[in-house]
Design a protein with these regions (language model features):
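Core of folded catalytic or high-affinity ligand/protein-binding domains
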Residues: 1-224
Length: 224
């Protein structure tokens, strides 16, 4: 049994829906759930969530958000959309695809080389600025300044200016692509009502499995 919402986005919400709807559930999640690997990933969260502390539950929600909802995975040296939230949102999907193109156009990533290794290199080199951006996004959430589609990237761009981070090179697109990092994901809030400022990329399906297990499995295996 797969439970879905009874809400359907309006015509003027085709670019971006502020909450999950029937289209998201049926077009986004349902096809993925026919894939054994995706279904096994989805099954990891509930057992851990049941035994987790409140603080751990917040991390688990974010891990689910940035994997099965807004995850990206490398396959054949190309970045593939894995998250149901990306695939069912026209604007989110367009932002992601355009970022793949922009990284090449701006010579940030050379797609003839090892793409994930280059992404990891940019991430490591800019980790301090990424941490500052995440802290800033967290503060914006707490102030309620990322609660709508219009606020999303407008306030993030203003944040870049405030932090003195130039919107070029690795930071020049509509979204930041970063290697899947549990510690980093634990810090960034879920961006439900506005565009996501960051997506996380796994080197492989096996790596996603291992990284999620590294956090979820010890919690799920706790004695009751």
């Amino acid at each position: 049994i797969f439970l879905i919402t009874d809400y359907l986005r309006t015509r003027d919400q085709m670019e971006f829906t502020p909450e999950p709807d029937m289209f998201h559930d049926i077009f986004g999640h349902l096809p993925y759930l026919t894939l054994d690997f995706y279904a096994r990933i989805e099954d990891k969260f509930a057992p851990a969530y049941k035994k987790a502390t409140q603080e751990e539950r917040e991390v688990i929600k974010r891990l689910a958000w940035y994997s099965t909802e807004f995850g990206l995975v490398m396959e054949d040296n190309r970045i593939r959309v894995f998250g149901a939230g990306i695939i069912s949102g026209r604007a989110e999907l367009a932002n992601t695809i355009m970022e793949f193109y922009r990284l090449s156009r701006d010579t940030v990533i050379d797609y003839s080389g090892d793409v994930f290794a280059q992404l990891q290199e940019h991430f490591d080199k800019n980790r301090e600025d990424i941490s500052r951006i995440i802290a800033g996004v967290k503060e914006l959430h707490q102030k309620g300044e990322m609660s709508s589609q219009d606020q999303g990237w407008n306030v993030v761009r203003a944040l870049y200016d405030k932090l003195g981070i130039s919107r070029e090179g690795y930071f020049g697109g509509e979204v930041i692509l970063a290697p899947f990092d549990v510690e980093m994901i634990a810090q960034i809030p879920k961006t439900v009502y506005a565009f996501n400022p960051m997506f996380f990329v796994c080197e492989s399906f096996e790596q996603m499995d291992a990284l999620l297990d590294s956090y979820l499995k010890p919690i799920a295996e706790r004695s009751s």
